[in-house]
From Swiss-Prot:
Keywords: Membrane, Transmembrane, Transmembrane helix. The keyword Flavoprotein does not apply. SUPFAM superfamilies: TolA/TonB C-terminal domain. GO terms for cellular component: membrane. It is a single-pass membrane protein. Its main location: membrane. NCBIfam families: tonB_Cterm (TIGR01352). InterPro entries: TonB/TolA_C (IPR006260). Residues 54-67 have a biased composition (Basic residues). Signal peptide: none annotated. It comes from Aquifex aeolicus (strain VF5). The chain crosses the membrane at residues 9-31. This is Uncharacterized protein aq_1982. Residues 53-74 are annotated as: Disordered.
Length: 214
């Protein structure tokens, strides 16, 4: 009995191994990718041939075209010691000096023709101020000042500066009468004077001498 069971067990074990081996072969055949054996590289054959140029046809010889390079511009330099002096042509520049000199002379001529206002004499009375004109005419004379004094002084001298438009831009008393009311009143009167305009752009000076008549 023991011998029969041992043989049966041995057959069973062998059948199991055979089945496992068969299953493994089947698995490899069905599921694993087919791996092709490496192929041997075939040698490449290279053939070198010499290509000959076709023979040239007889004809006229072609001329070579040569491009001319731009000539370099020569710059003349000042001659140094020991060098041969070279004449340098300078361009004549148009000078504006003659025109400027002409304009300056014209302005100076106009200034000489237009004299300063110079000395002006004026006589002050109770009703009016009579002005004896100098070299420049008056176009406006304000009303005469009114003084509340018992006696008029001898004279008052006022220096004036007049612009080209004819307005008195500055006035100062150079000789006072001694009466403040008279001096200040004549100064205000003088600043309101207006002379004729001139074309020359300059300020003219003059002196007005006021005297009084009763």
């Amino acid at each position: 009995m023991v011998k029969v069971s041992a043989e049966n067990f041995l057959y069973f074990a062998i059948s199991v191994l055979v089945n496992l081996l068969f299953l493994k072969i089947l698995y490899i055949y069905l599921f694993l990718p087919n791996i092709s054996p490496p192929q041997a590289f075939t040698p490449l054959s290279v053939k070198i041939e010499e290509i000959k140029a076709p023979p040239k046809k007889p004809g006229k010889p072609q001329k070579k075209v040569v491009k001319k390079k731009p000539e370099a511009v020569s710059v003349s330099q000042a001659p140094e010691k020991g060098d041969v002096p070279v004449e340098v042509k300078e361009e004549k520049e148009v000078s504006l000096l003659p025109e400027l000199e002409k304009k300056i002379k014209e302005r100076l001529k106009k200034r000489k023709e237009v004299k300063q206002i110079g000395e002006i004499s004026a006589v002050v009375s109770k009703q009016k101020v009579e002005i004896r004109l100098g070299s420049r005419k008056l176009v406006h004379v304000p009303p005469p000042p009114v003084f509340h004094v018992k006696e008029y002084p001898s004279l008052v001298r006022i220096k004036i500066w007049v612009n080209p438009e004819g307005r008195v831009i500055r006035a100062i008393i150079i000789q006072r009468s001694g009466v403040t009311e008279v001096d200040e009143g004549l100064l205000r009167f003088t600043k309101k004077l207006k002379f004729e305009p001139i074309e020359v752009p300059e300020v003219q000076e003059g002196v007005i001498t006021f005297t009084f008549s009763t």
